């Protein structure tokens, strides 16, 4: 009996060590939903957290909106005050802010949706590609700011996304967007 317990514990420890070094796969979803197309990728730290790049036909598919999500178990009760607020973040080494645009109750936690804004697609795509290639990562950390403590609202304050397939995914999203019947001509 002790032998089985001994072997089971060693096997469990071995699996935990091996699986902790597993690397997240870069799986992109590129599709159209209603009038817009998007390309999204799952996070490496929290797989369910997505980073999405959205294109709208009314912009002639020339602008890109960026959104990302953070799931949290923390609910201090006043999370609704974050809506429409700019929360301090660090994008790789760059301190900036992201606007909270939606908070959705999910299971026993909350999914907080942020936006970094709307940008001209060519310039933004080039900037993201250059930033990712320079740092070899695309990482967002929610950080403390004036009258804001990140750990009050977020149990995990950091996530990163693989963007190796960013350019082909955006090109595919542009093609989908341009095929929209609602594109301005």
Task: Tell me the role of every PLM-derived stretch.
Residues 1-24:
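Classical Sec-dependent N-terminal signal peptides that target proteins to the secretory pathway
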């Amino acid at each position: 009996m002790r032998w089985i317990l001994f072997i089971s514990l060693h096997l469990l420890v071995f699996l935990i060590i091996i699986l902790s070094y597993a690397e997240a796969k870069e799986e992109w979803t590129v599709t159209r939903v209603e009038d817009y197309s998007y390309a999204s990728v799952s996070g490496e730290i929290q797989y369910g957290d997505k980073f999405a790049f959205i294109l709208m036909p009314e912009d002639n598919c020339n602008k890109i909106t960026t959104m990302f999500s953070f799931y949290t178990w923390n609910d201090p009760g006043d999370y609704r005050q974050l809506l429409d607020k700019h929360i301090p973040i660090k994008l790789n080494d760059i301190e900036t802010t992201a606007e909270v645009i939606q908070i959705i109750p999910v299971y026993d936690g909350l999914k907080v949706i942020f936006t970094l804004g709307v940008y001209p697609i060519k310039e933004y795509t080039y900037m993201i590609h250059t930033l990712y290639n320079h740092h070899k990562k695309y990482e967002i950390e929610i950080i403390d700011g004036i009258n804001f403590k990140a750990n009050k609202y977020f149990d995990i304050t950091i996530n990163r996304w693989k963007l190796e397939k960013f350019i082909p995914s955006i090109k595919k999203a542009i093609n989908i967007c341009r095929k929209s019947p609602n594109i301005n001509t």
